């Protein structure tokens, strides 16, 4: 069971009350099927789903459009469970979209199945995107999502993304 409840604010010194992490709606961790109501109470504007559509359908027993389409704008960025994104540039582009939405005052919710592994990886990469060093990004993520950074493959992706991100910044 995910720690810190089914939904929690991702807290750091920027974008206060704008970034949330969550379990998948209607999935195995949302046993009361109440997560969507919690999202509504927070006035979430956008959802970033990190699950492939096939995983979402299998675990939530509904299509994403059936759950999100009526209430939320959403972005699907599929990452296989316990795996990593395939492309650094796609990740960088999505992080920039997230950054732009937050700069425009939008409330964003990010989730995978349990809201831990892929969600923690994504949010730690976002902190790098914002200019945090890797040690602070890991520390902030672990403070917010206690069981994050336990997957060696995702840990290596974070290290490699950090190098990619720094190389891009040197070229600009």
Where are these regions (language model features)?
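Conserved G/P- and acidic residue-centered "switch" motifs that form tight phosphate/ATP-binding loops
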Residues: 115
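Cys-dependent protein tyrosine phosphatase-like superfamily
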Residues: 1-109, 121-172
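Conserved SAM/SAH-binding loop-helix junction
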Residues: 118
């Amino acid at each position: 069971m995910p720690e810190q409840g089914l939904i929690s604010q991702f807290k750091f010194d920027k974008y206060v009350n704008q970034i949330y992490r969550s379990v998948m709606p209607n999935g195995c961790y949302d046993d009361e099927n109440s997560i969507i109501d919690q999202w509504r109470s927070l006035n979430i504007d956008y959802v970033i789903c990190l699950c492939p559509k096939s995983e979402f359908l299998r675990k939530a027993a509904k299509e994403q459009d059936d759950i999100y389409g009526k209430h939320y704008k959403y972005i699907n960025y599929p990452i296989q469970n316990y795996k990593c994104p395939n492309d650094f540039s796609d990740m960088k582009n999505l992080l920039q979209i997230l950054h732009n939405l937050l700069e425009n005052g939008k409330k964003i919710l990010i989730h995978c199945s349990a809201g831990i592994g892929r969600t923690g990886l994504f949010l730690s990469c976002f902190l790098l995107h914002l200019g945090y060093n890797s040690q602070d990004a890991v520390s902030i993520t672990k403070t917010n999502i206690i069981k994050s950074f336990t997957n060696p493959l995702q840990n290596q992706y974070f290290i490699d993304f950090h190098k990619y991100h720094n190389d891009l910044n040197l070229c600009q």
